[in-house]
C-alpha cells in the first residue's frame, strides 16, 4: 500500500468540494479555498499526480438505467489446490472483472471469501446471473445473497 501524502486544510477543502461536484471550476474552487485559481490548479494537479484524485466520473443512479435490484452476495471459494496453474482465487478474481453485473468485489476475512455488490434489472436477471454465471464458475463453492430493501445512505465521498 502506498503511503498517503500529507494533506493540509486547503487540500481537504478542495477535495471536499470536488467530491461534491467534480465539474466545479477552478475559479469556484479558488473562492472555496481562499487561493488564486492558478494556486488551486497546482494543488489539484499535485493531488492527481499523487493518486489522491484517481479520476473524474459521472454518477449514474442504477434505477435510472433499469437496474432496480441491488444484491450483496457473499461468496465462498473451494479450498486451494496443489496445482499452481489452477488457483481458485486467481481464477475467480480474473472472472469477476468480466461480469458487468458486479460493480464491487471485496476480499473478506471470516466465513466467506468475497463480497460482491451486484446491480441487476430484476429477480429474473439475478437468477440468471447466479445460475448461469456465478455458480457455474469452477472456483465457487457456495454463495449467500442479501437484497437491498432501502438505501439509507449512499455516497462516493471519502471523509477528508
Model feature map: region roles:
Residues 1-160:
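A compositional/biophysical signature of low hydrophobicity enriched in polar/charged and small residues
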Amino acid at each position: 500500500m502506498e503511503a498517503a501524502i500529507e494533506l493540509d486544510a486547503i487540500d481537504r477543502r478542495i477535495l471536499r468540494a470536488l467530491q461534491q461536484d467534480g465539474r466545479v471550476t477552478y475559479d469556484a474552487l479558488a473562492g472555496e479555498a481562499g487561493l488564486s485559481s492558478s494556486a488551486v490548479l497546482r494543488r489539484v494537479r499535485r493531488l492527481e499526480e499523487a493518486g489522491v484524485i484517481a479520476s473524474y466520473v459521472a454518477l449514474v443512479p442504477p434505477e435510472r438505467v433499469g437496474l432496480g435490484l441491488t444484491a450483496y452476495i457473499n461468496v465462498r471459494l473451494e479450498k486451494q489446490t496443489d496445482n499452481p496453474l489452477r488457483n481458485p482465487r486467481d481464477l475467480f478474481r480474473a472472472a469477476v472483472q468480466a461480469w458487468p453485473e458486479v460493480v464491487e468485489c471485496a476480499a473478506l476475512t471470516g466465513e466467506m471469501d468475497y463480497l460482491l455488490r451486484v446491480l441487476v434489472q430484476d429477480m429474473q436477471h439475478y437468477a440468471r446471473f447466479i445460475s448461469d454465471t456465478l455458480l457455474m464458475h469452477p472456483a465457487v463453492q457456495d454463495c449467500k445473497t442479501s437484497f437491498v430493501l432501502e438505501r439509507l445512505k449512499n455516497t462516493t465521498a471519502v471523509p477528508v
